[in-house]
Regions:
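A conserved mid-protein helix/loop that constitutes part of the nucleotide-sugar donor-binding site
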Residues: 21-26, 173-190, 210, 293
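A charged, aromatic-enriched C-terminal amphipathic alpha-helix characteristic of glycosyltransferases
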Residues: 19, 307-361
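Aromatic "clamp/platform" in nucleotide-sugar-dependent glycosyltransferases that forms part
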Residues: 230, 249
Length: 399
């Protein structure tokens, strides 16, 4: 393998992939600062159907690319074409896995096995947590955990207090469970009368309207929930909040959690023990998945003790500073150097034995989520009349 100078990054279209777009954009600037030459390729350059393989291989040769980093690893056809293209062009490919390792399992995705088989063919996987790193090594991949290192949005800010304002940030989609955030604050207001919720984000047409309808139907929530939509500048909302809330089914890294920690906010989150930013002693508290009562109780306990809020906020800020101090450049240098070795001689293939149990438990939990997700899809099809309508059409044709 020749020395890495020009790096091509493959990702989805701008504005369609949330954290993936954000991570890829950050990486472009990062590599540029380090003296590499980044080349950005998206679907507008490569397409997503026949011909993608040839287009990527031609771009690699034409632009003198030494290494490809794949940020769009979740569609079987595209990932297969991109791996094949790098083989055609004779350069290594690293897959940047932005999600938790069992994201596809938790979603009930039927092509999860095919994606994992393709990942084994990649030269390496960049993971976001040690649990993800361990999983990919368990299935035979060369992998290294390199967490995001978001810029400090709160530089110069000194927190003066912890108002009873809960901040939730994310997309209005099922896996983020925005309705659970509203229900949590509804319970919280039974003991903390002036508690309120600020929601930053948006979603598909009708998703916000459904949430607003729920709020209007609950007298106890009048004036207590603010829908602020998507905001690029989140600092004012971080400054004015007193605690963060994360109600996700699963996360790969959770930018929202890190931003809350930048602002010295304690964070209450649904249990995701594989996410290191939610570890005990880092200003974060995990409660059982889907348990809005437990989330409300934890927020109430924090708000009832301003000194504890301040202590946990300080831990949260230190947790962010620890992430920020991670040696990103050294980690990438180690990964690039390891690519020069055969996989059998790699130092990045042995799983961390201390995390194997956590990986196994997470896979089992997420397999259960996947079964539930598949059952919900089948139920929606039946209740929506898709199968029944087809049977009726067939019956009419037969008669």
């Amino acid at each position: 393998m020749k020395p890495v100078k020009t790096i091509a990054m493959v990702y989805r279209e701008t504005g369609t992939c949330g954290g993936i777009q954000r991570g890829a954009s950050f990486q472009v600037g990062q590599f540029g600062e380090w003296g590499f030459e980044p080349v950005v390729l998206s679907e507008s350059d490569l397409g997503r159907g026949p011909g993608r393989r040839e287009k990527l291989a031609a771009a690699i040769r034409g632009r003198g690319v030494d290494l490809v980093i794949e940020h769009d690893a979740y569609a079987e056809e595209k990932l297969s074409a991109d791996i094949a293209a790098t083989r055609d062009a004779g350069v290594p490919i690293i897959v940047f896995w932005h999600s938790v390792f069992s994201w596809m399992v938790a979603n009930g995705s039927r092509n999860a096995g095919a994606i994992f088989d393709l990942l084994r063919r990649a030269d390496a996987i960049i993971a976001l947590t040690s649990a993800d790193e361990t999983f990919f090594r368990m299935i035979g991949c060369r992998s290294l955990a390199i967490p995001y290192c978001d810029a400090d949005l709160m530089e110069g800010f000194e927190r003066g207090g912890y108002p009873h304002r809960v901040l939730w940030m994310g997309r209005f989609v099922g896996l983020k469970r925005p309705l659970d955030a509203i229900k949590t604050v509804e319970r919280l207001r039974e003991t903390v009368r002036d508690a309120e919720l600020v929601m930053l984000g948006d979603g598909a047409a009708g998703s916000r309207a459904a949430l607003e309808k729920y709020v209007r139907s609950r007298p106890g929530l009048r004036g207590a929930v603010r829908f602020e939509g998507f905001r690029k500048d989140v600092r004012p909302y971080l400054e004015s909040a007193g605690a963060g809330l994360v109600t996700s089914k699963f996360e790969g890294f959770s930018h929202a959690t890190v931003e809350m920690k930048m602002a010295s906010l304690p964070v209450v989150a649904y249990s995701m023990p594989y996410v290191e930013t939610l570890a005990e002693g880092t200003g974060a508290f995990q409660v059982p998945q889907g348990d809005v009562d437990a989330a409300a109780a934890r927020l109430a306990a924090l708000f009832s003790d301003p000194a504890e809020c301040a202590r946990q906020g300080a831990l949260a800020r230190r947790s962010y500073e620890a992430i920020r101090s991670f040696d990103q450049r050294g980690a990438y240098g180690r990964l690039f150097a390891d690519l020069e070795k055969p996989r059998s001689a790699s130092s990045l293939t042995a799983p961390d034995a201390s995390r194997v149990r956590l990986v196994a438990e997470t896979l089992l939990e997420h397999a259960g989520m996947g079964l539930d997700a598949s059952a919900e899809r089948i139920s929606r099809k039946l209740s929506g009349g898709g199968l029944l309508a087809a049977l009726r059409r067939l019956s009419r044709w037969w008669r």
